[in-house]
Design a protein with these regions (language model features):
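Rossmann-like NAD(P)H-binding beta-loop-alpha module
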Residues: 148-152, 156-222
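Short acidic, glycine/serine/threonine-rich loops at helix termini
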Residues: 59-60, 141-144, 167-172, 185, ...
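C-terminal catalytic/substrate-binding lobe primarily of soluble NAD(P)-dependent oxidoreductases
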Residues: 2-11, 202-203, 207-434
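Short gly/pro/ser/thr-enriched loop/turn and capping motifs at secondary-structure boundaries
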Residues: 53-54, 136-141, 145, 162-166, ...
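Rossmann-fold NAD(P)-binding glycine/threonine-rich loop
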Residues: 109-125, 132-160
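N-terminal glycine-/serine-/threonine-rich beta1-alpha1-beta2 phosphate-ribose binding loop
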Residues: 1-121
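Short, ordered loop/turn segments at secondary-structure junctions
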Residues: 50-52, 94, 110-111, 133-137, ...
Length: 434
């Protein structure tokens, strides 16, 4: 992504900006719109949300004049609006991937169920896809990335989110030939694994966010999802179920997230994890056996070794996303994508005693929380992927703290997400048995 500022200026001067279709105009989408308005060589001519009013509010926040907005209900109407210099606002997400002038689709919905449909339609329509929907990525990302490559388009995680920010450091370290010992993110407070939206309602109002979304962060689900995404993009593994989540400072990260034989918490090198105390930063701990390079790292104040730290003290979430969209078009590259075969799994852990006949709710709600384990362990125990849990009906009681298994379910709903996950599992050597 070198000189992307210059490339965007070139596109602006030629009148050929990168064109983005934005699906989801909530908190994330609002920031994307606002940021895009400041940028050269990039436009968002189509915005979708569940209501026209939400889409209009997002555009208003981005200082788009009301007379530059048009409500549309068809591809043809959207094309006409865009041709007249207006932003097409829609409530039907399927309009956006079908628009001929759109080069990149950004999924800012946060729904795995909707995300897979958006991805499939975008790939089929030959659009690059920016997957902000990390919950969808950890469920079916590998097969979506495979399908995108076969279609000649880019499937990518979003710059600004922790996974892509971590991968930026990981790519730097591995390109230089260093061995990655650990990669992770910071958390500001220890997890509250029993958190519910009700208990967090007041805090959510203060932060102007939904209680469900806040709960997903507080109960650890979001951290598990993000680090599972990193694992499946790198081959690094969770060292233990749920990760260690050790306390650390910026100065001690490389001393904590290293093998126990070196005084750290890891059973083995090559781990994904999270640290309490270094939010909002992300990090990579690396090492090298090369004596001259070790000496050079000491001279550059990287510490005495054997492990060294790369630290990015920020991740700007949605604010950075337009750069990923531009990168797909200008360079044909991703900000991060899954490997062909996943290595880790996000699993669902009961938050409270669950009863036979109950229908499981959404991530960040009341029934379960997300955790992480190796894919091998999840398959051995026949564990249900976190992204498939919503809407499942239980066939038996489940004690608090126990992972939910495929065989705990009355049945799996027949949804596009479930079908796509089955296809992904069939591409692996030992698929789980539903």
């Amino acid at each position: 992504m070198n000189a992307i500022n210059e490339r965007l200026l070139e596109l602006e001067s030629k009148g050929t900006p990168v064109t983005i279709g934005l699906i989801g105009a909530g908190q994330m989408g609002q920031e994307i719109l606002c940021q895009a308005q400041l940028m050269k060589g990039l436009r968002i001519p189509a915005v979708v949300d569940v209501t026209f009013e939400r889409a209009e509010l997002a555009c208003q926040m981005a200082n788009v004049p009301a007379d530059k907005l048009a409500r549309v209900n068809s591809v043809e109407a959207a094309q006409a609006a865009i041709a007249s210099g207006r932003i097409a606002l829609a409530t039907d997400w399927q309009i956006v991937p079908k628009l001929p002038g759109i080069q990149v689709v950004v999924d800012a919905t946060g729904s795995p169920e909707l995300g897979v449909s958006i991805a499939l339609e975008s790939i089929q329509s030959k659009k690059h896809l920016v997957m902000m929907n990390v919950e969808c990525d950890v469920t079916v990302g590998p097969i979506l990335n495979r399908m995108a490559r076969e279609a000649g388009v880019i499937y990518t995680l979003a710059a600004g989110d922790e996974p892509a920010a971590i991968l930026e450091l990981y790519r730097f370290a591995t390109a230089l030939g260093f061995e990655v010992v650990a990669a992770g993110k910071g958390k500001n407070n220890p997890l509250d694994i029993a958190a519910t939206p009700d208990a967090l309602a007041a805090r959510a109002r203060e932060r102007d966010m939904s209680a469900r979304m806040l709960c997903e962060f507080v109960d650890g689900s979001k951290t598990a999802v993000e680090m599972c995404s990193v694992a499946n993009a790198t081959g690094l593994l969770p060292d233990v179920r749920g990760m260690h989540g050790a306390k650390a400072t910026r100065e001690t990260l490389h001393q904590v997230f290293c093998p126990k034989t070196q005084g750290g918490v890891l059973n083995r090198p090559g781990a994904v994890d999270f640290a309490i105390g270094v939010h909002p930063g992300v990090f990579v701990v690396f090492t090298t056996d090369q004596p001259r390079l070790r000496h050079g790292l000491i001279q550059r104040d990287m510490g005495k070794g054997p492990n060294y730290l790369l630290f990015r003290p920020y991740h700007l979430c949605s604010i950075e996303v337009p750069l990923t969209a531009a990168q797909t078009v200008i360079y044909g590259e991703s900000s991060g994508h899954p490997l062909p075969s996943p290595v880790a799994e996000c699993i669902a852990i009961a938050k409270r005693p669950l009863k036979a006949g109950e229908t499981l709710d959404a991530i960040g709600e009341y029934c379960y929380r997300g955790s992480i384990d190796t894919l091998a362990a999840a398959r051995q125990e026949n564990l249900l992927p976190l992204g498939l849990a919503r809407g499942c009906v239980l066939a038996r009681d489940i004690a608090v703290g126990r992972p939910i298994r495929y065989d705990d379910l009355d049945h799996l709903p027949d949804t596009p997400l479930v079908r796509m996950r089955h296809r992904q599992d069939q591409l692996s050597s030992k698929p789980p048995s539903p």
